[in-house]
Amino acid sequence: MTDIKTSLPRIAAIGIAVSALGLAGCDDTGADPKLQIGANPLLPPLHQYLLPPIRIATPVEWGSQTPKVTQGLQVHALAAGLQHPRSVYVLPNGDVLVVESNGPKAPVFRPKDLITGVVQLFAGAKAKDANRITLLRDTNGDGIPDQRTVFLDHLNSPFGIALVGHDLYVANTDAIMRYPYQDGQTSITAKGTKLTDLPGGPIDHHWTKSLLASPDGSKLYVGVGSNCNVGENGLQAEYERAAIWEVDRATGAHRVFASGVRNPTGLQWEPTTGKLWAIANERDEIGPDLVPDYLTSVQDGGFYGWPYSYYGQHLDPRVQPQRPDLVARAIVPDYALSSHVAPLGFAMSSGHGFPASYESGAFVGEHGSWDRTPLNGYKVVFVPFKDGKPSGPAQDVVTGFLDTNNHTHGRPVGLAVDRTGALLIADDVGNTVWRVSSATTAPKPAS
């Protein structure tokens, strides 16, 4: 990533230019986000904009600071000086894989595309793409890696990882690749084989491809985001996108497992019921409180509304012609996270290593908003579960990424739980992986 010290003046100048264009002149003041968290979120009337209002958090360095954690927890940097870390994955032997990645260059078809690029640059999201996976190894169990190696490189905007037996799968933006892996291996030099193509460029609006193996290892599940906000690039560009794929691991054949999910950036199995759950980024540009991003169970064959509707049968008038047949069966998501928080990280609690209040539930990394006031997200929350379903309000677990001056030291992305039960957080603006653990428990691998 370009060094923050040298890039901030250039980024600030761009931000001033954006403001001068009057792009932030619309009323974007939102309601209390707490009103949009849970099973029955506030869904106010929508507002349409010629150009979206822009509210951007200015990136600054962490320096000697760290994120803030709730009582009973502690946090330290597992690894710093990374290059735009987007996701983390823990191997069976405890090694941690860090995906350092960014999206491919996007084409500009309309003024809004240019604005999007400016927003991403100003927010620190347009870093140089390392296209690699770095391995971190802690040999003495003190929670601090003493080995750091390039595990796999020359990838194409990778995001998701899944290990099944001795096959390591990497979801590049345009394909799932398979690599041979042996326990304890610190690098892979073998050329990978393609399992299946994935929807990629030239637009590739949502480039991240989340990845999860089925419990029996026979299938892979892939989150494939839409190619636009809400159909403006033509629905022909959305073929098999805004969907969760099921891929046969033996043949590479795939089917759409669920559709109408605008951007499913994280997939997990709920441990007590065995059901598939996902986090999703919903649409923009119809107001500061629309549409809430969400956490939901995923039904085989289910349709979740995008682009025609949201939260069941709430129509989006920007999409014409409508599909009343699809809208009629659109599923209401289980749990709203509030609007524009941009959930990009998802991990189910392991049931050990954290205080008892975190024994059952989901951790969600909220990357943060760019189009509402006040800013929303920029934290990691915990949604408690009971009997396999959300059972209460989301709780702040890790904050401090955003300060009171709307400066962002970092932005949480991918999450993982290590063998000790500690929570790992990829921070793609601070270029750090943070490790959050119990303040009273020394690192000890789970049996």
Language-model-derived ranges and their functions:
Residues L78-G81, V150-L155, L195-I203, V256-G260, ...:
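Surface loop/turn motifs at the tips and blade-to-blade linkers of beta-strand repeat domains
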Residues G22-G25:
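C-terminal motif of bacterial Sec signal peptides marking the signal peptidase cleavage site
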Residues I144-D167, N172-S214:
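Asp-box/WD-like beta-propeller blade repeats and closely related beta-sheet repeat scaffolds
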Residues D28-V69, P107-F109, V118-A123, K128-A130, ...:
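Beta-propeller domain segments
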Residues V88, I161, L211, P264-L267, ...:
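Hydrophobic core register within WD40 beta-propeller blades
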Residues A416-P445:
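Blade-level signature of beta-propeller repeat domains, shared across WD40, Kelch, NHL, RCC1
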